[in-house]
Amino acid sequence: MQTLMSHSRITPLPGAITKEEIKNQLLVHERRFLSKPNRKDQWNVLPQSAHSKNTVNPVRKIADACAVPPHPEKKVIKLHLGDPSVGGKLPPSEIAVQAMHESVSSHMFDGYGPAVGALAAREAIVERYSSADNVFTADDVVLASGCSHALQMAIEAVANAGENILVPHPGFPLYSTLCRPHNIVDKPYKIDMTGEDVRIDLSYMATIIDDNTKAIIVNNPGNPTGGVFTKEHLEEILAFAHQYKLIIIADEIYGDLVYNGATFYPLASLSPKVPIITCDGIAKRWMVPGWRLGWLIIHNHFGVLTDVKNGIVALSQKIVGPCSLVQGALPKILRETPEDYFVYTRNVIETNANIVDSILADVPGMRVVKPKGAMYMMVNISRTAYGSDVSFCQNLIREESVFCLPGQAFSAPGYFRVVLTCGSEDMEEAALRIREFCYRNFNQHSDSEDSSDEGLDLSAMESD
């Protein structure tokens, strides 16, 4: 034992590393490791992607600005939601509900289907919408998760980063929301709401076209304008597109939801000369926006859209097709919904439009844009008489418990939008409250004539 102990205290050879030195080196390495920024014992905040950061719907900002408390003693009347199911006045047809029951109970549509959509559903679309003037086949149809998704696929298949698409102002703000994350420029063109019929200012549109312009989005009937383009004006639009060789993305979700003497003409039925991508769905005429089924019809004149069509098919694979259950119900919905259902819907909206128009017609500093289609009405207000459209809507909520959306949400400052889908009693009550609000708040010293479409000067406007 004595010998072993003496050996354990042998003096280290020259150049050997001592135990203390090893310990010190380990401490140095530990400090270096702990000082590294990528250490794994803590979580770093992960920033959102540029794509998601650029995905902004301006309606959300405006809606937040109007999140004020209503008058506590007055019934709330909601005229700001573009959802026809709200309020229960416009329910889906019994046929649509029955078709969904059958689709679910059959268990034939519980699994995946083709990404472009079930053949039977696409054939039903051909059966309903194809005509001698508008011939297409099931191979030209791609189903989508709502018309908004159809628009998204059309935009993404047509334009690249740095290129631009012409969008209507006033217009549906989602067009811009769909463009910007891809660095596609949404160029606004003017919608003229001053005449008997709403029109596109084609002279202005000609000034904003350049070599990077890929398409024109045409929304007819229009949201938020309630306008329906005449056949003559649609032919002018088509001639313009043909002259500049620009394809058209036709947003026709409101289709034949027209009234007050208007007629709806599907754009693709009027011209074999312009390639058109029609976007449509069941949300706003069958009153089921939550069922999320839309479609694209690719009218591939001259073969211009052959590659784009392939792109749309590829994009459909992102979601592997929309809800199979609704696809299963679609043939029955399209074929068997009675015409009386659509007549009832048009009558409800037309009655409401005429109620509001008659009650607000003589209000000073205000001009009603009488609608002929869709389910909306735009009302122009004098800024000097009532302030901005945002403050007008805020105060209308506070004082009258009536909810409307400011025109700024649709690139139309100086207006507010009224949704026309509630019952006629609520609509009349709301219009009377708006009138009383205006009489009570009208600035007697203002020039009420300044209510002339201030929202249509696009030169100083943001795109959203």
Curated annotation (Swiss-Prot):
Induction: Up-regulated in response to oxidative stress. It catalyses: L-tyrosine + 2-oxoglutarate = 3-(4-hydroxyphenyl)pyruvate + L-glutamate; 3-hydroxy-L-phenylalanine + 2-oxoglutarate = 3-(3-hydroxyphenyl)pyruvate + L-glutamate. GO terms for biological process: biosynthetic process; dauer entry; L-phenylalanine catabolic process; tyrosine catabolic process. Disruption phenotype: RNAi-mediated knockdown increases lifespan by 17.8%, and reduces tyrosine aminotransferase activity by 75% thus increasing tyrosine levels. RNAi-mediated knockdown delays reproductive adult development in response to oxidative stress induced by the superoxide paraquat. RNAi-mediated knockdown increases dauer formation in eak-4 mg348, eak-3 mg344, eak-5 mg337, eak-2 mg433, or eak-7 tm3188 mutant backgrounds at 25 degrees Celsius. RNAi-mediated knockdown increases aak-2 phosphorylation, but does not impair energy production in a eak-4 mg348 mutant background. The modification N6-(pyridoxal phosphate)lysine is found at residue 284. InterPro entries: Aminotransferase_I/II_large, PyrdxlP-dep_Trfase, PyrdxlP-dep_Trfase_major, PyrdxlP-dep_Trfase_small, TyrNic_aminoTrfase, Tyrosine_aminoTrfase. Pathway: Amino-acid degradation; L-phenylalanine degradation; acetoacetate and fumarate from L-phenylalanine: step 2/6. It comes from the Eukaryota. One of its GO terms (molecular function) is L-tyrosine-2-oxoglutarate transaminase activity. Keywords: Aminotransferase, Pyridoxal phosphate, Transferase, Tyrosine catabolism. Expressed in the muscle. Expressed in the hypodermis and intestine. Its cofactor is pyridoxal 5'-phosphate. It holds the Pfam family Aminotran_1_2. Its EC number is 2.6.1.5. PANTHER family: TYROSINE AMINOTRANSFERASE (PTHR45744:SF2). Transaminase involved in tyrosine breakdown. Converts tyrosine to p-hydroxyphenylpyruvate. Has no transaminase activity towards phenylalanine. Plays protective role against oxidative stress, metabolizing meta-tyrosine and negatively regulating its accumulation. Plays a role in modulating the daf-2/insulin receptor-like transduction pathway through regulating tyrosine levels. Negatively regulates dauer formation. Plays a role in longevity. Homodimer. Belongs to the class-I pyridoxal-phosphate-dependent aminotransferase family. This is Tyrosine aminotransferase. It comes from Caenorhabditis elegans. The lineage of its organism: Eukaryota, Metazoa, Ecdysozoa, Nematoda, Chromadorea. The gene is tatn-1.
